[in-house]
């Protein structure tokens, strides 16, 4: 019988195993805060980004975003990324949206969304809005 050929396994040096990876992109959505009173209440989420990738202006950043800004960012990504399918955001919540468990579920959904989007190579290299949304306190969505 023919012997199946296996790819050659390269041994890593200790330096390679413990060296800083070539591309780091870590995104966390943390620290939700609810603001306002009554009908004017809303929740913001802190986006913490750590990277060494050249497509981002800052290696470490932290910005706050409302869900409505995530929606605008999502729409902008869909318009500029014709070849990439943009994953959906966690759904709109109309009742009891300020309960801790509801806010935590949304936080997790927003974090997963950002990690998927930011991890896509075409979006990383071609998006005009990704780094701005993740890093710029002055992010201004276009209509």
UniProtKB/Swiss-Prot annotation:
Amino-acid positions noted as binding a 1,2-diacyl-sn-glycero-3-phospho-(1D-myo-inositol-3-phosphate) in the UniProt annotation, renumbered to this chain: 66, 68, 92, 97, 106
Please report the stretch or stretches of sequence annotated as the PX domain: 23-140
Q: How does it sit in the membrane?
A: Peripheral membrane protein
Instruction: Determine the domain of life of the protein's source.
Output: Eukaryota
Q: Which residues form the signal peptide?
A: none
The alphabetical list of record keywords is: Cytoplasm, Golgi apparatus, Lipid-binding, Membrane, Protein transport, Transport
The record's Gene Ontology biological-process terms are:
endocytic recycling; intracellular protein transport; late endosome to Golgi transport
What SMART domains does this protein map onto? PX
Family of this protein: Belongs to the sorting nexin family.
Q: What is this protein called?
A: Sorting nexin-3
Q: Which organism is it from?
A: Schizosaccharomyces pombe (strain 972 / ATCC 24843) (Fission yeast)
